[in-house]
Design a protein with these regions (language model features):
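Accessory terminal regions of nucleic-acid processing enzymes
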Residues: 1-461
Length: 461
């Protein structure tokens, strides 16, 4: 077994100009590391699994900024020096080799890239976590947002909550998998490679773990965490699992396309985000783990990967932005991440738009605006009527919080309740002044664009 890299050596023109150079530099660096790892492994004459484990220790040590190091020190190391570093850590203990998966392509080994480079290299395909967008099941992204992400549009407004989820998941991944192994008796097989589908080359997968079950069954393990607020994990009740995780794991099984992999176990551990300090605390009780098996469904795998390949060839390769979704709020949120808001650049010159091109669009906008105004008027009238009638009923109830509406025979037709409901609010301005660090961690800024269309009345000649 050898280290492999099959990243594209030439960067396609459809990628955004701001990331093309960085992509090229990163790809070259990964190829260089791959070659050096193979040369050093040959020198040590260690098995792939043992060399991989020890070389990973070397890479992590030389990449750790807390030790005053940086990854450039590893890159400057010769194969001979790397071999010496690995041999110095060898204690005669052997580690298992990876499993060969002949029906998929190894893109590269994620164990020997930084998190920053890993995020950059995700531009080379559609991953499992992207699949829910293609299947219309994502509450957080749209086709337009996925297009911006894959071609490499620079992020204008970072999503702090998404970054928090990623950091938490990465930090707790081994804990979740290890807890599952203790519960089930499963054995974790070493795996850290990014894979690419043979049939659909723009579809990629980076499984969290390959597990050997006590029955001899080989499965994928996908670790998840969820903040357990008052123990209300609604999406995980009664054996249910969030739909986006189902598409993600189904896509993984499709990319691997191996008859030995019969299913994927989705394993979720409730956690608490420690407010200060950035540490993540998981439950100590393994029974708190939610787990659900997703068996192979080759028809669904095909449906997902066909949609991903079609998206890539239609939009990414052609540099064509998809149409907005039917969710205007989500469209706006996603677009603000990648497209600078006009209010952020007050110095921009006034633009001229073609009347012939935009008149029809503006007329449709005006009609929609008029319909909305009429609906708002009706809503306001209905609300006033409702409130007036409610006040008459409340007056009849006097100071009671509950009343029965009975007929002459005593039969109850309605039960009316009028209770006080308290809502907590945070004084954000005061919080920002008193505890700026906490505000920075949990606060966010929203932008509102004031849009209007006014007809211009032509002057009489």
């Amino acid at each position: 077994m050898r280290f492999e890299c099959n990243l594209p050596k030439e960067i396609p023109e459809y990628y955004h100009y701001e990331i093309r150079d960085r992509l090229k530099e990163t790809v070259d660096r990964v190829y260089m590391r791959t070659e050096k790892l193979n040369e050093a492994m040959d020198i040590t004459k260690l098995s792939f699994g043992t060399f991989h484990r020890l070389a990973k220790e070397v890479f992590d040590w030389y990449s750790d900024p807390e030790k005053g190091n940086n990854v450039e020190l590893f890159d400057q190391m010769s194969p001979k020096k790397l071999a010496r570093e690995v041999k110095s850590r060898y204690t005669k203990k052997e580690f298992p080799d990876f499993i060969e998966f002949p029906n998929t392509i190894v893109l590269y080994d994620t164990a020997f890239v930084s998190t920053k480079d890993w995020e950059l290299l995700r531009h080379f395909g559609i991953g499992g976590s992207d699949s829910s967008v293609l299947m219309g099941l994502s509450h957080y992204n749209t086709l337009e947002g996925l297009y911006y992400d894959k071609v490499g549009f620079p992020v204008v407004l970072d999503d702090k909550s998404k970054n928090q989820v990623f950091k938490r998941g990465h930090f707790m991944e081994d804990t979740v998998i290890d807890s599952f192994c203790k519960m089930t008796g499963a054995t974790r097989i070493p795996e850290s490679r990014m894979f690419r589908s043979v049939k659909y080359p723009n579809t990629i997968a980076n499984p969290d773990a390959i597990l050997l079950m006590p029955s001899g069954e080989l499965v994928i393990g996908e670790a998840k965490t969820a903040v357990d607020v008052y123990n209300k994990m609604v999406e995980w009740r009664n054996g249910a699992v969030p739909a986006n995780y189902v598409t993600q794991t189904t896509q993984y099984l499709g990319v691997m396309n191996d008859p030995r992999l019969t299913k994927c176990w989705i394993i979720c551990l409730p956690v608490q985000d420690q407010s200060l300090g950035g540490e993540y605390i998981g439950s100590e009780i393994t029974s708190d783990i939610r787990r659900q098996e997703i068996p192979r469904d080759e028809a669904f795998e095909e449906e997902i990967m066909q949609a991903e390949e079609k998206f890539w060839k239609t939009y990414v390769e052609q540099n064509v932005k998809p149409e907005p979704s039917m969710n205007s709020e989500l469209d706006k949120t996603v677009r603000l991440r990648f497209v600078p808001s006009p209010i952020s650049n007050p110095e921009a010159p006034k633009r001229v738009l073609s009347f012939e091109q935009y008149n029809s669009l503006i007329e449709k906008y005006k009609k929609a605006d008029e319909a909305l105004e009429a609906a708002n008027k009706l809503q306001k009238e209905a609300k006033n009527t409702r409130d007036s009638l409610k006040n008459q009923i409340v007056e009849a109830m006097e100071d009671s919080q509950e009343a029965d509406v009975r007929d002459a025979s005593g039969e109850v037709h309605y039960v009316i309740k009028n209770k006080v409901s308290n809502t907590d609010y945070v004084k954000t301005k005061d919080l920002k002044l008193a505890f700026p660090e906490i505000f920075e961690r949990f606060g966010y800024t929203t932008s509102k664009m004031l849009f209007s269309v006014k007809p211009v009345i032509a002057k009489k000649k």
